[in-house]
Amino acid sequence: MSNVSVETKFGSEMSEPVIICSGRIDSVNASEFAGKLDECCEKYPEGSLILDFERLDYISSAGLRVLLGLSEKNRSLEIIGTSPEVYDIFETTGFVELFSVSKKIKSVSVEGCEIISQGASGSVYLIDTDTIIKVFMPGEKLSVVQQERNTAQKAFLKGIPTAISYDVVKVGDSYGILYEMLKAQSLANILTEHPARIEEYVNDYVDLLRQLHSTSGDRGSFTSMKDIYHEAIDYSAKYLDDKDVRKCKALIDSIPDRDTLVHGDLHPGNIMVTDAGMMMIDLSRMGIGHPVFDLLEMAASHKNLAESAPDVARMLIGPPEMLLRLWDLTLRNYFPDKSGEELKKTEKQLLGFARLANVIAPFIGPTLSEEQIEGFLNEARVNLFPIIDDLIGSIDW
């Protein structure tokens, strides 16, 4: 007997609903299926339609025509979780060229695994001596996860020391990426346990940063950091005065254009130390742009966070005193030719730019409460907006 069931799941952090389809879709019930999808379209008129076919056993040409009809109505479709049999139907008919279609993803458990890094987009766990996994926040879309995996692969091919990504998996209701990482320990853990060794590691830390910033990327493979920040500022605009939004965008636009690779969230929790040297992980915000985009984020996490919220810094990355010492040594090693006075001027400049991290926090951290968002933005109102005119156009290195 032909039957099809359609239900909608709308996660708290998701911008689009997930429409779960189960059973069979054939000529007998294709019109019923179309009607249920039309109801979903009316209820959620904006954005993509994400169809979860994990529980779908079969789809006939009649069902495919229903999907084609939605496409002709300019609704973007993303089909996830297909069984090998259903995926074969999409592939044989050429529909994989029309829609984003992905196969069912295997599940992995992180129960009992050590957390080695945490951030706004998710947490990184040590699965075994050879494997780590980044688990994304609940509700993050599969397309975003796949994009990060692709970015990591492109960075690896560019010669950037990073873990080899080899599979996208499910962890409960979240997605994750498995990475090969041989006998690795995070730099944050090493410096937390052995603070006296910080000078031993800082040269390699800065060398890795310099290697990244001397590697060119292309817009076809990597997103512009300016575009990322503009999108984030647009998202935060609902919390800000129009004048402050314009000033923030002017500050971003005043940064000299570069085609160099930028990590976007570099701190010792995102650096793994292996027998082969240091490697970067968590490339969710990697793009191309001026190195200041990395240095402002480092100033935000190493200096501003350590001083203004030491308990938070300790929980997310490591001891605040370690972060402050690492920041000081990193700055001196990254700008070896600057005098003491020049270095103080550059640090003051970077600490000002670092308040942009407060402005984009609502976009970067979708799980932040309204109270937390207001706290971040108040920091920007006090420490960025009064000096923003002085910062605009000030990057001359």
Indicate residue ranges for each PLM-predicted region.
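STAS-typified acidic loop motif
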Residues: 2-35, 53-55
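Amphipathic alpha-helical interaction surfaces in cytosolic regulatory modules
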Residues: 27-99
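An alpha-helical support segment within catalytic cores of ATP-dependent transferases
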Residues: 106, 214-264, 268-269, 274
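Conserved N-terminal boundary motif of the eukaryotic protein kinase catalytic domain
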Residues: 107-115
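ATP-binding pocket architecture of kinase catalytic cores
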Residues: 114-219
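Catalytic activation segment of kinase domains across protein kinase-like and atypical kinase folds
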Residues: 272-296
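Active-site activation/catalytic loop segments of kinase-like enzymes and analogous catalytic loops
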Residues: 295-337, 353-371
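ATP/Mg2+ or Mg2+-diphosphate-binding catalytic cores
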Residues: 341, 355-397
